[in-house]
């Protein structure tokens, strides 16, 4: 056992003495030691109950002949951190989470790992850390919350509240309606109910085979979710000493491809691109941002979920057959794009896992022949504005897929929010938000507040927004993020001026500023990078080491 390094032989008597202080007995030193990586925190609705989940898991591990050791990671709630300086810390928290998993697991030489994530950067951070450790690993998330319901009987989610701010600012709804939306949107514990980043990543864990069926869609705080916890705990005990189930044997090139196929079929958050690039790097798997358009071109978009379609939420997807039904439909009609021989954590191949899966409601999960789109729900655009690429969630587009407009430029998200409220962005404009990339922020803030304001003010179909920052999974509209190179590293987005004409063609995968090469060269000569004081030592360190978005915004020591 790996854990023999801390528990076997007379030289380890001091180690055992400390472990006895934690309650271990003689017989425990012959059992596998399993790390239970929790992410319990009171301030995140998807995490405040995870201490109870960890107890269920630990009890089941003990019943099955292993010794659990619970430890915790930090967590940041993107919705609560949104719209102020707190959002600077969201993406960097992913690296701290990865480091904490690696640190605890390797410092104590634990044999296997079960991770309990749920929201935002916590799932990808845990995946990155687990891949560094490379022991048998299972992920079992906290689960999504149910959708909210207003007094009028309308189904809503957190994204509805952000959009209501814009509607209230432009006097489209009353104060009473505004308060009703605020109080109804998040009715229970769990990750936010739409296909936002949390549910996207928990769904992709299922697609990669590192989580059991239902991980992405079974509601939080349900009996069904509790049974999933017990199944995961039993399974980690079965495989704790089996090297076939080391996480790098599960998250392979094939698994990563399957994840991106499901991402395209379900119109996942644009953040998944950032995270899968980082996860692939830790797994030693090749994934280039340029590859994603090929996958998208081969995969139909068959499940549309809020915020892209506000009548469908994660619990609806679960009732309709879940992630397995999506994969089964893709495999039956577009099977060549899925790697069906990929190994899953149960020991089955993906093909075996899907043998009984089927769509139970074709109004929720469509057949390929009746897909929302013949291509996937994400796209990578290239052009003089994004020579290294940028990302758009095509599933969330509500207007034209071609757009030409005049730039209205802002040098920060705060500046953009004030400008939008004051009416500086009008129909036909391209709202440009820059110096919000991984280095420029630093931290690559999400632009949910600006996009939601535009939607709520009735401009969602008539305005494009481009940024070197990123978007919440709750964003919809013609929103282009992750522009690389970013403004802070000399990207053209930093040289744009108000009135410059910008063209976006989603189907041609292009984004272009109609500015001559001569004019660009002139602007470069005159350009001086705006100086932004960063008081936080952690953010300064992050700024110095972080790569750009086209590489996953990872800390790069090379």
Curated annotation (Swiss-Prot):
A GO molecular function held by the record: dihydroxy-acid dehydratase activity
Cofactor(s) recorded in Swiss-Prot or TrEMBL: [2Fe-2S] cluster; Mg(2+)
Residues that bear N6-carboxylysine: 121
Database matches in SUPFAM superfamilies: IlvD/EDD N-terminal domain-like, LeuD/IlvD-like
Listed GO biological process terms: isoleucine biosynthetic process; L-valine biosynthetic process
Pathway: Amino-acid biosynthesis; L-isoleucine biosynthesis; L-isoleucine from 2-oxobutanoate: step 3/4; Amino-acid biosynthesis; L-valine biosynthesis; L-valine from pyruvate: step 3/4
Residues forming coiled coils: none
Sorted UniProt keywords: 2Fe-2S, Amino-acid biosynthesis, Branched-chain amino acid biosynthesis, Iron, Iron-sulfur, Lyase, Magnesium, Metal-binding
Family annotation (InterPro entries): Dihydro-acid_dehy_C, DihydroxyA_deHydtase, DiOHA_6PGluconate_deHydtase_CS, ILV_EDD_C, ILV_EDD_N, IlvD/EDD_N
GO cellular component: cytosol
EC number: 4.2.1.9
Binding-site residues for [2Fe-2S] cluster, renumbered to this chain: 119, 192
Catalytic activity: (2R)-2,3-dihydroxy-3-methylbutanoate = 3-methyl-2-oxobutanoate + H2O; (2R,3R)-2,3-dihydroxy-3-methylpentanoate = (S)-3-methyl-2-oxopentanoate + H2O
Function: Functions in the biosynthesis of branched-chain amino acids. Catalyzes the dehydration of (2R,3R)-2,3-dihydroxy-3-methylpentanoate (2,3-dihydroxy-3-methylvalerate) into 2-oxo-3-methylpentanoate (2-oxo-3-methylvalerate) and of (2R)-2,3-dihydroxy-3-methylbutanoate (2,3-dihydroxyisovalerate) into 2-oxo-3-methylbutanoate (2-oxoisovalerate), the penultimate precursor to L-isoleucine and L-valine, respectively.
PANTHER family according to UniProt: D-XYLONATE DEHYDRATASE, D-XYLONATE DEHYDRATASE YAGF-RELATED
Descriptive protein name: Dihydroxy-acid dehydratase
Organism: Campylobacter jejuni subsp. jejuni serotype O:2 (strain ATCC 700819 / NCTC 11168)
């Amino acid at each position: 056992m790996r854990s023999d390094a801390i528990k076997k032989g007379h030289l380890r008597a001091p180690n055992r003495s400390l472990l006895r202080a934690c309650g271990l007995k003689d017989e425990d030193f012959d059992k596998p030691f399993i790390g239970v990586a929790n992410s319990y925190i009171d301030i995140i609705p998807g995490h405040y109950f995870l201490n109870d989940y960890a107890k269920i898991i630990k009890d089941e591990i003990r019943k099955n002949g292993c010794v659990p050791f619970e430890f915790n990671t930090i967590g940041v709630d993107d919705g609560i951190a949104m719209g102020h300086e707190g959002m600077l810390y969201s993406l960097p928290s992913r690296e701290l989470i990865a480091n904490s998993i690696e640190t605890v697991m390797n410092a104590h030489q634990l044999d296997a790992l079960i991770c309990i994530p749920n929201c935002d950067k916590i799932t990808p951070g845990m995946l990155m850390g687990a891949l560094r450790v490379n022991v048998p690993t299972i992920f079992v998330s906290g689960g999504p919350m149910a959708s909210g319901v207003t007094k009028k009987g309308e189904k809503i989610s957190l994204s509805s509240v952000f959009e209501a701010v814009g509607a209230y600012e432009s006097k489209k709804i009353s104060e009473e309606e505004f308060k009703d939306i605020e109080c109804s949107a998040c009715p229970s514990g769990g990750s936010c109910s739409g296909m936002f980043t949390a549910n996207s990543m928990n769904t992709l864990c299922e697609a990669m085979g590192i989580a059991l069926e239902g991980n992405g869609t079974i509601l939080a705080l349900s009996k069904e979710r509790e049974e999933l916890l017990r199944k995961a705990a039993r399974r980690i005990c079965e495989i704790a000493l089996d090297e076939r189930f080391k996480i790098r044997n599960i998250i392979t090139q094939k698994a990563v491809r399957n994840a991106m196929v499901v991402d395209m079929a379900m119109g996942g958050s644009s953040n998944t691109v950032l995270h899968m690039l980082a996860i692939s790097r830790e797994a030693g798997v090749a994934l280039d941002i340029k590859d994603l358009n090929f996958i998208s071109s081969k995969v139909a978009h068959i499940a549309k979920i809020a915020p892209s379609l506000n009548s469908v939420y994660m619990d609806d997807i679960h009732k309709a057959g879940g992630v397995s039904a999506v994969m089964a439909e893709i495999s039956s009609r577009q099977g060549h794009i899925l790697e069906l021989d990929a190994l899953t954590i149960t020991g089955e191949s993906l093909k075996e896992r899907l043998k009984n899966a089927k769509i139970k409601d074709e109004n929720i999960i469509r057949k390929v022949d009746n897909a929302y789109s013949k291509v996937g729900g994400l796209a990578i655009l290239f052009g003089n504005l994004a020579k290294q690429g940028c990302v758009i969630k095509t599933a969330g587009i509500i207007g034209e897929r071609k757009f030409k407009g005049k730039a209205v430029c802002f040098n920060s998200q705060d500046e953009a929010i004030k400008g939008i409220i004051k009416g500086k962005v009008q129909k036909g404009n391209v709202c440009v938000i820059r110096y919000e990339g991984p280095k420029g922020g630093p931290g690559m803030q999400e632009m949910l507040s600006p996009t939601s304001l535009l939607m709520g003010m009735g401009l969602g179909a008539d305005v494009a927004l481009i940024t070197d920052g990123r978007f919440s999974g709750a964003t919809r509209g013609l929103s282009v993020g992750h522009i690389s190179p970013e403004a802070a590293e000399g990207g053209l987005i930093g040289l744009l001026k108000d009135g410059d004409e910008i063209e976006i063609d989603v189907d041609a995968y292009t984004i272009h500023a109609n500015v001559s090469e001569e004019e660009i060269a002139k602007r470069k000569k005159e350009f001086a990078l705006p100086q932004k004081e960063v008081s936080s030592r952690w953010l300064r360190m992050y700024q110095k080491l972080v790569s750009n978005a086209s590489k996953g915004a990872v800390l790069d020591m090379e």
